[in-house]
Swiss-Prot record:
Native organism: Syntrophus aciditrophicus (strain SB)
Cofactor: Mg(2+); Zn(2+)
Function of the protein: DNA-dependent RNA polymerase catalyzes the transcription of DNA into RNA using the four ribonucleoside triphosphates as substrates.
Binding site for Mg(2+): D461, D463, D465
Alphabetical list of SMART domains matching this protein: RPOLA_N
An annotated GO BP: DNA-templated transcription
EC number: 2.7.7.6
Protein name, entry field: DNA-directed RNA polymerase subunit beta'
Co-factor binding details: Binds 1 Mg(2+) ion per subunit. Binds 2 Zn(2+) ions per subunit.
Family recorded in the similarity comment: Belongs to the RNA polymerase beta' chain family.
UniProt keywords, alphabetically: DNA-directed RNA polymerase, Magnesium, Metal-binding, Nucleotidyltransferase, Transcription, Transferase, Zinc
Keyword Zinc found: yes
Gene (UniProt): rpoC
Positions contributing to Zn(2+) 2 binding: C801, C875, C882, C885
GO cellular component: DNA-directed RNA polymerase complex
């Protein structure tokens, strides 16, 4: 009996190996895999359906078709296991071997492997130093190659055409020299390659290489040779002599009805190879003419090419239905390939899906599961329970009973389901909260019920959405589902640490209604001694819900309303009444939940959320709120505003006709006008809706209105002011699909209705919106996929890496306003060094301490501007990152656990809001956007302080700013900066240094439509190289007939249009304080305002650079911008930036480009070429610092890395990405971006390899680089020199150490070719490669340190207690993991 199990093979355990290697298969290796040669192209006999002998499905080679049964039927069943039948030669064994046994085809002539030939760069070509064209001519029998020149003047590897070959043969005789053709010749050459010798030779050549191209070529060859040398692969293995045949069950042939067969394309491809191979063998035996044999060899080469990679060379071979056949490569590639279809995503059993509907009476940890569905999902458990209870004895009878659906079955199901977590998932699962665990509640009906508060996390609504249910089977899976995935354990969003379970829509409306107050209603002004009294009075109908009353709470008389006291009943005791004694809108409710979570913990918060939901629904129903047309009040003076705007537009038109303004300015002004009119009507309308007159005992009184539409928008339940504006105000300006704004606005609103033309104009935008949305989803999904791929191996691997490096974080400013204080930005991070109070000098936060909410407030109160914190960017951990550098796990609010997959969380957090970003590139036309940016108002009370501000007083007494980087700071009483405002060049200052300002005071203003060029000194205008008709044109406006002097593009001559100022002596004046001349070079498009010989004073405008008007420069925004940043692409018009500190001067123009020279105080000057027509943003004599832009344009991240280093670059990337998300109102914590940027900066480019094994220009991982250098230094040799490189996320994913991960991402063929050539080893460190290999992932509970936890049982007291003990411990095992830190 004990031997019976040895009959069954144990399933192979995927955990047993810890690395996997890929290399090129040698012919011997292929033969060792094979169980026999496939000689015939036949597959199966069409009459008997039995496989043909020696054919592609031969049972003798590949194993029996039926379990333990030979083909002729002589041996059947287990007792003959392992016998080989004498008659048909089939081994009696399980038929499963047909999935793993391989065969082979012995090729009549060698054939090149297309991957090594055509995958660029050609590997065979690299080894032999032949180009791909030359190789193809040899392999496809067009040219001969000289193998051994002997005594002839030919050189080895010379190519000869047929004619040349024949002539030379005649000349030198048959033994004069040796030449070959086809794959045999190439194989011969590859066999002769001496890798060691070639390696030495190439390294010497590299030292003497003169030109850059030569070096690059040698380096490329050296890489391939090195890879072959180190991996132990032989070059001739790239040419095949034996072809493996994959197991038949992996290329099945299935009979359809009607005698036809459905087959895998591979069978056709193999058939072609076998047919051609057999024909070639026959021709060779018959000694056929060389030309025929050669043609057959070429056809065999092509057949093998198509089998390996169809379409790689020439046209793809198509099958019967004009569809290209799927080759072996296609089986791996793309979304439908093996990697992504079957290994990374599999179908799941024990799952079901159905439509969802709302379950308002569920608790947060519950979901409603239809009985029918539950019965199907839990069937095996129900069978077991019925057997346990003794209703049935066998599974068969249990099955029958369940089919009858008797009462016992439902009882059993109830017991099985009780407290058994199931997982609900809604596609698309954009972040980890798209899959959560709930306890099922059995319900009638066929729809799954979902708790309303988790809808935000799932992004679900009930307009027909479907969700899937999955049952975790093992006890470990159940524990993980309960501990880690239960909806009650996922209150905070992992993206930003704010609660994601917050009331929305109806609930918000109900609670808003409950906490609003109303004048003069029943019970107004009553006083109560405690909340209970209020409740009884309300129940008795003695006081109305919104009445203002006084109540004694915590020995204090509070003014409040009845509704708020009722709300107070459900608030946890720890939270004071003042927190909710206000109108509770959505924001306040989110804050309440956040506050409750921090103060009272998870459990209390869950209870509070549920109570809020119940109360919200109840009072939303009570309020009887409705949406009616009468609620939309159109403002009385709308007509007047529109008429006035029309009049103003005509006025502007007239100015244009008179030539006072240009067409662009006219367009901008009109757009501005209408934007203002729309704004005005909207504010009038909102004013009308927000307030209403109420007749009270004190007479008429204006009070906040109870207009339902206003309440919906004000509470944050649904709708926004912008939408109400379109319903009752005026629709306003519309954009064309190109992004330009149409001058004529829609003056009607939806209540009045649109005319046909107005409707047509608005369809433009609407259609573009729909097209955008469709594109956006695909693009956003692809971005997420790239992010996940680059960050998937970023896991918390240790507690502390012990680094002494970190980054500085200061408050985030935008337009002078502090958007996020330093304290808020470092919340949940670990401090690098002690933070001192700048005034008292006491230590606020000790080094290596995590900053929690209270410390964050402390930092802000102390007015600390910048904090040094630890960051993943500077983490020293070799694999993954350490917990201290990462900081707080935002989803749970404590320091992150070891094993957390922070890379994937980062990728999800950035990718998930991707669909909310806009797709388009913004065109900031002349909309109200500009108008905001032409003035500067103080946002705080305080004292003005000029910083780096140079100014002059112009002749009309205006203070004009002359500096380019000037700032105005507003300081408070302690002289701490409250606001920093950058003042542009040419602005007019309205405040003096040291003056005190109030909030809202105007501090500066400037012309929004052009950038001025100002005179620095008094003097006379002199033009240089401004030649009419060549460099300058008087452009006459067609409409107005007025002229302007405009610099135009000019070809040829070395002309530099400029304006200089001459002093009294006629010399060029000097700029005060410097040695530079008062001279301005003008770029194309500048309008000159002065004429030659004019007298000007300092501060006067000489010329204007118009800001692009109708279509301003496209600001790449939204999703494309995020992708551009993460892909580290060079922007289209990137700015040239200075590499050094120094003084600017202009050099002689070269090749139509401006030459800007930066001269440092010590060292060599640097020259920069700037294309003409681009505006140079520095003047002669300006001081610049390293990293400062010399012209207008976007930064190029690669330059930033080179000049300012990794931290500055990381800061730039993080801030730029954040900017895009902030515009859409999405909050994502900086640390997620930092994780991605860390992955982009993982590699170093070797500049000088020193005595290390690296090659010049090779890119290597930072840690490998450091390791090799340490080794070299230890040996007393020269270490390598390298510089950091920035890789885009796609490049970074493909250059990861794991070839399995890279191959499953993109460019599968290329990755596998490279990996096999180099004999790469994948140590399975990331998540993806482990999923593909079918192992537990090395993160979370799959970490080795958690897997090794044992279970200790207490000494046997009695069997039962031991059982329980073991059970508890196995639960504990997973729980411990949660609290491991």
């Amino acid at each position: 009996m004990e031997d019976v199990f040895s009959y069954f093979e144990k399933p192979k355990d995927p955990i047993r190996f810890n690395a996997i290697k890929i290399s090129i298969a040698s012919p011997d290796k292929i033969l060792s895999w094979s169980y026999g040669e496939v000689k015939k192209p036949e597959t199966i006999n069409y009459r008997t359906f039995k496989p043909e002998r020696d054919g592609l499905f031969c049972a003798k080679i590949f194993g029996p078709v039926k379990d333990y049964e030979c083909l002729c039927g002589r041996y059947k069943r287990m007792k003959h296991r392992g016998v080989v039948c004498e008659k048909c030669g089939v081994e009696v064994i399980k038929s499963k071997v047909r999935r793993e046994r391989m065969g082979h085809i012995t090729l009549a002539t060698p054939v090149a492997h297309i991957w090594f030939l055509k995958s660029l760069p050609s590997r065979i070509g690299n080894v032999l130093d032949l180009t791909l064209k030359e190789l193809e001519r040899i392999l496809y029998f067009e040219s001969w190659i000289v193998l051994d020149p002997r005594n002839t003047p030919l050189r080895k590897k010379d190519l000869l055409s047929d004619e040349e070959y024949n002539d030379l043969r005649e000349q030198y005789g048959p033994d004069g020299f040796q030449a070959g053709i086809g794959a045999e010749a190439v194989r011969k050459l590859l066999e002769e390659v001496d890798l060691e010798g070639l390696d030495v030779e190439l390294r010497d050549e590299l030292k003497t290489a003169s030109s850059d191209t030569k070096r690059k070529k040698v380096i490329k060859r050296l890489k391939v040779i090195e890879a072959l040398r180190k991996s132990g692969n032989r070059p001739e293995w790239m040419i095949l002599t034996v072809l493996p045949v994959i197991p038949p069950d992996l290329r099945p042939l299935v009979p359809l009805d009607g005698g036809r067969f459905a087959t895998s394309d591979l069978n056709d491809l193999y058939r072609r190879v076998i047919n051609r191979n057999n024909r070639l063998k026959r021709l060779q035996e018959l000694n056929a003419p060389e030309i025929i044999i050669r043609n057959e060899k070429r056809m065999l080469q092509e057949a093998v090419d198509v089998l390996f990679d169809n379409g790689r060379r020439g046209r793809a071979i198509t099958g019967t239905n004009k569809r290209p056949l799927k080759s072996l490569s296609d089986m791996l590639k793309g979304k439908q390939g093996r990697f992504r279809q079957n290994l990374l995503g599999k179908r799941v059993d024990y799952s079901g899906r159905s439509v969802i509907t709302v379950g308002p009476d569920l608790r947060l940890h519950q979901c409603g599961l239809p009985k029918k569905m539950a019965l199907e999902l839990f069937k095996p458990f129900v069978y077991n329970r019925l057997q346990e209870k003794g209703y049935v004895t066998t599974v068969k009878s249990a099955k029958k009973m369940v089919e009858r659906e008797t009462a016992e079955v439902w009882d059993a199901l109830d017991e099985v389901v009780r407290e058994y977590p199931v997982m609900l998932n809604r596609a698309p699962t954009l972040h980890r909260l798209g899959l959560q665990a709930f306890e099922p509640v059995l319900i009638e009906g066929k729809a799954i019920q979902l708790h309303p508060l988790v809808c935000t996390a799932f992004n679900a609504d009930f307009d027909g959405d479907q969700m899937a249910v999955h049952v975790p089977l093992s006890i470990e899976a159940q524990t993980e589902a309960r501990v880690l995935m239960m909806s009650t354990n996922n209150i905070l969003s992992p993206a930003n640490g704010k609660p994601i379970i917050i009331p929305s829509q109806d609930v918000v409306l109900g609670i808003y209604y409950l906490t609003r107050s109303k004048e003069d209603v029943l019970g107004h002004g009553m006083s109560f001694s405690n909340p209970e009294e209020v409740r009884s009075a309300f129940d008795a109908g003695a006081v109305e819900l919104r009445a203002r009353i006084k109540v004694r709470i915590d020995d204090e008389l509070k003014e409040t309303t009845v509704g708020r006291v009722i709300l107070y009943e459900i608030i946890p005791e720890a939270i004071s009444f003042d927190v909710i004694n206000k109108v509770m809108n959505k924001k306040e409710l989110a804050n309440l939940i956040d506050y409750c979570y921090r103060l009272c913990g998870e459990k209390t918060t869950v209870i509070l959320a549920d109570r809020l939901k119940d109360m919200g629904f109840k009072y939303a129903t009570h309020s009887g709120m409705s949406f009616a047309v009468r609620n939309l009040n159109i403002p009385k003076n709308k007509k007047d505003i529109v008429v006035r705007a029309d009049r103003d537009v005509l006025e502007i038109q007239k100015q244009y006709m008179d030539g006072l303004i240009t067409d662009g300015e006219r367009y901008n002004k009109v757009i501005d006008l209408w934007a203002q009119a729309t704004e005005k009507i909207a504010s009038e309308m909102m004013g009308g809706i927000e307030t209403e007159e109420q007749i009270t005992t004190e007479g008429k009184k204006v009070v906040e209105s109870f207009n339902p539409i206003y309440m919906m928008a004000d509470s944050g339940a649904r709708g926004s002011n912008a939408q109400i504006r379109q319903l009752a105000g005026m629709r306003g300006l519309m954009a064309k699909p190109s992004g330009e704004i149409i001058e004529t606005p829609i003056t009607a609103n939806f209540r009045e209705g649109l005319t046909v033309l107005q409707y047509f104009i608005s369809t433009h935008g609407a259609r573009k919106g729909l097209a955008d949305t469709a594109l956006k989803t695909a693009n956003s999904g692809y971005l997420t996929r790239r992010l996940v791929d680059v960050a998937q191996d970023c896991i918390i691997t240790q507690q502390d890496c012990g680094t002494v490096d970190g980054i500085s974080v200061s408050a985030l400013m935008e337009g002078g306003e502090i958007i996020e204080t330093a304290g808020e930005r470092v919340l949940g991070r670990v401090v690098l060094e002690d933070i001192m109070d700048p005034f008292t000098g006491e230590v606020l936060v000790g080094a290596n301490q995590e900053i929690d909410e209270s410390l964050s407030e402390k930092i802000d109160r102390a007015g600390i501007e910048s904090v040094r914190i630890r960051s993943v960017l500077t983490c020293k951990a070799k694999y993954g990152v350490c917990a201290r550098c990462y900081g707080r796990d935002l989803g749970h609010g404590h320091l992150v656990n070891i094993g957390e997959a922070v890379g994937i969380i980062a990728a999800q957090s950035i990718g998930e809001p991707g669909t909310q970003l806009t797709m388009r590139t913004f065109h900031i036309g002349g909309t109200a956007k500009f108008e905001e940016h032409s003035t500067l108002d103080s946002r705080h009370d305080g004292i003005v302080k000029y910083v780096d501000l140079n100014y002059v007083v112009s002749k009309i007494g205006e203070t004009v700013v002359m500096s380019r980087h000037g700032e105005i700071h507003v300081l408070d009483e302690q002289l701490r900066s409250r606001g920093k405002y950058t003042v542009p060049y040419g602005a007019h200052l309205k405040v003096k240094d040291g003056q005190s300002v109030k909030r809202g005071d105007r501090m500066a203003e400037w012309d929004p439509f052009s950038i001025p060029i100002l005179a620095e000194v008094d003097g006379t205008v002199k033009f240089g190289d401004i030649i009419e008709g060549k460099t300058m044109q008087e452009q006459v406006d067609e409409v107005t007939g007025l002229s302007r002097k405009v610099i135009v593009e000019f070809k040829g001559a070395d002309l530099r249009p400029r304006v200089s100022l001459k002093d009294a002596t006629g010399k060029t004046a000097k700029v005060p304080g410097t040695n530079a001349a008062a001279r301005h070079l003008l770029s194309v498009g500048v309008n000159i305002v002065v004429s030659e010989g004019d007298q000007v004073k300092a501060g006067d405008i000489i010329a204007k650079i118009p800001r692009e008007t109708t279509k301003t420069k496209d600001i790449t925004g939204g999703l494309p911008r995020v992708a551009e940043l993460f892909e580290a692409r060079k922007p289209k018009d990137f700015a040239v930036i200075s590499e050094i500190d120094g003084v600017v001067s202009y050099g002689k123009d070269a090749k139509g480009k401006r030459k800007v020279i930066v001269t440092p105080e010590i060292g060599d000057e640097k020259e920069y070429l700037i294309p003409k027509g681009k505006h140079v943003s520095v003047q002669e004599g300006d001081r610049v610092i390293a990293g400062e832009a010399l012209m207008s344009g976007v930064n190029n991240p690669h330059d930033l890395l080179m000049i300012k280093g990794e931290k500055a670059l990381a800061r730039y990337l993080v801030d730029e990405v954040q900017e895009v998300y902030r515009l859409q109102g999405v909050k994502i914590n900086d640390k997620h971006m930092e994780v991605i940027v860390r992955q982009m900066l993982r590699r170093v480019k070797v500049i000088d390899p020193g005595d290390t094994p690296f090659m010049a220009d090779e890119q290597v991982e930072k840690f490998r680089f450091q390791e090799e250098n340490e080794k070299a230094i230890a040996r007393g040799e020269q270490p390598a020199i390298g510089e950091p490189v920035l890789l885009g996320i796609t490049k970074a994913s493909l250059s990861t150490q794991s070839f399995i991960s890279a191959a499953s991402f993109q460019e599968t063929t290329r990755v596998l070719t490279e990996a096999s050539l180099a004999g790469k080893v994948d140590y399975l460190r990331g998540l993806k490669e482990n999923v593909i290999m079918g192992r537990l992932i090395p993160a979370g509970t799959g970490l080795v340190m958690y897997r090794k936890l044992g279970i200790k049982t207490v000494a046997d007291e009695d069997a039962e207690s031991v059982e329980i003990e073991g059970d508890e411990n196995s639960n504990k095992k997973s729980l411990d993991m949660h609290a491991a830190n």
